[in-house]
Amino acid sequence: MNPITMKLVVDDLILQALREDITFEDVSTASVCPTARPATVELIAKADGIIAGLDVFARTFELLDPQSSVLFDVSDGDEVHAGDHVGQVRGDARVLLSGERVALNYLQRMSGIATYTHRMVAALEGTKTVLVDTRKTTPGMRVFEKAAVEIGGGSNHRYNLSTAVMLKDNHIDAAGGVARAIEMARAHASFTTTVEIECENLGMVREAVEAGADIIMFDNMTHDDMAAAVELIAGRAKTECSGNVDANNIRALADLGVDFISSGALTHSAPILDLSLKHLRLLDGK
């Protein structure tokens, strides 16, 4: 992540996670390390996958003690295998022990998302289709989870509700129809704001094209209807399909010729990548 995002957004989130975990005192660490003692601990991969979130991992220790340092053997986006040495953390043993869980939580979560995304993107090779995420993220984790999607080779859909207009079924109901919803969005939003609308059938797609939507999402439409919708739109709007996307069907969806495939599973269903901090070694000889 860029330094500005790290300072303005990420630091506060990491500190909140540390406060949640440590609160008043790490009683286990205080019991065995009552005073500062220099130490190292090794970061080891326990499964195969794509690494993501190294800067967040390191920053977790730095926020506890600016004198902490991390030396990595890999970079974000690199593939690791079970047993690989990923890096070494150096600093006060109390900091290494107290920050371990929060730092690993971020790294495991982000690496899991990057690994899952990488697998899905590989299925799209040779097509024009771009895999994008959704807002189905863990509360308080969006900035990390969306960064992990990008590291895994995917792209980000809108970051939040202010980024773009996305008219869903309830918006359409509130406006009184597809065309009216698009008309109202154009009247309210800046001319620079993209207007996307969710369609459930070909009739809605036809109305959305005629009303001038920028992006038309096919939400849980049948394969045949989506193929017909792409032909109907004929390049007059960008196309996106969504709903129950997985590694088994993503290629068939891309072969329809859609511009984007969105998948909430990238962030809500990706398993963590198992990583561990092992072999803490005290450096003071005591």
For the regions a language model picked out, list residue spans one by one.
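Short, structured secondary-structure boundary patches
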Residues: D219, A237-C241, R281-K286
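Acidic/glycine-rich phosphate/pyrophosphate-binding loops and surrounding catalytic core
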Residues: N2-A211, I215, A227-L232, K238-C241, ...
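Basic/polar N-terminal segments that are highly enriched at the extreme N-terminus
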Residues: M1-I4, D284-K286
